[in-house]
Swiss-Prot record:
Protein name as catalogued: Large ribosomal subunit protein bL25
A GO biological process held by the record: translation
Gene that this sequence comes from: rplY
Species this chain originates from: Staphylococcus aureus (strain MRSA252)
GO cellular component, one term: cytosolic large ribosomal subunit
Assembly and interaction partners: Part of the 50S ribosomal subunit; part of the 5S rRNA/L5/L18/L25 subcomplex. Contacts the 5S rRNA. Binds to the 5S rRNA independently of L5 and L18.
């Protein structure tokens, strides 16, 4: 469990104040949830990035707020891609004994037999909904695809649960499949198709049979 310090923001802040705050390398944030009132704080952006890389998206953080330390998770955050900057964070104070349902990424492991034979690995499901207490939420769920041949697939029911958590997705939902490669047409087939297009005479729209007879005369 990683720790992060925050500083309480006093009073109401204007857009100009928040802009200046971000320019100084700080991120405005709010803390709310279990056992705490809503508190406006600020955290160092670089330190926050270090912590989130350590604990991952669903990890628990010990957040210092004033004289207290609160166990929180990142409920949400906003990111400005143009400035490459985190602009706001929502910290959710949590009860460590209370289960939560969150999205956990699926990580494919190994190289499928079918892929070695030219098949294509398709992954329709990139995240699984997982219910667990905060300290039992996995960083990722590994799915071994080594034994998959072409036209083989794995569903949610095939995913091995190796921790104290429950997967909430429909058991029949497809996680990964290996499909046959798309066959490219041969040169002979391409030439044949081009020949068919050239032999087809375009039909003149609006030309009647009577017009055709006059033309023949």
């Amino acid at each position: 469990m990683a720790s992060l310090k925050s500083i309480i923001r006093q009073g109401k802040q204007t857009r100009s104040d928040l802009k200046q705050l971000r320019k100084s390398g700080k991120v405005p944030a709010v803390v709310y949830g279990y056992g705490t009132k809503n508190v406006s704080v600020k955290v160092d952006e670089v330190e926050f990035i270090k912590v989130i890389r350590e604990v991952c998206r669903n990890g628990v953080i010990e957040l210092g707020v004033g004289s207290k330390t609160i166990k929180v998770m990142v409920a949400d955050y906003q990111f400005d891609p143009l400035k490459n900057q985190i602009t706001h964070i929502d910290f959710l104070a949590i009860n460590m004994s209370e289960e939560r349902t969150v999205e956990v990424p699926v990580q494919l492991v190994g190289e499928a037999v079918g892929a070695k034979e030219g098949g294509v690995v398709e992954q329709p499901l990139f995240n699984l909904e997982v219910t667990a207490t905060p300290d039992n939420i996995p960083e990722a769920i590994e799915v071994d695809i080594t034994e998959l041949n072409i036209n083989d697939s794995l569903t949610v029911a095939d995913v091995k649960v190796t921790g104290d958590f429950k997967i909430e997705n429909d058991s029949a939902e497809s996680v990964v499949t290996v499909v046959a490669p798309t066959e490219e047409p041969t040169e002979e087939e391409i030439e044949a198709m081009e020949g068919e297009q050239q032999t087809e005479e375009p039909e003149v729209v609006g030309e009647s049979k009577e017009d055709e007879e006059k033309t023949e005369e």
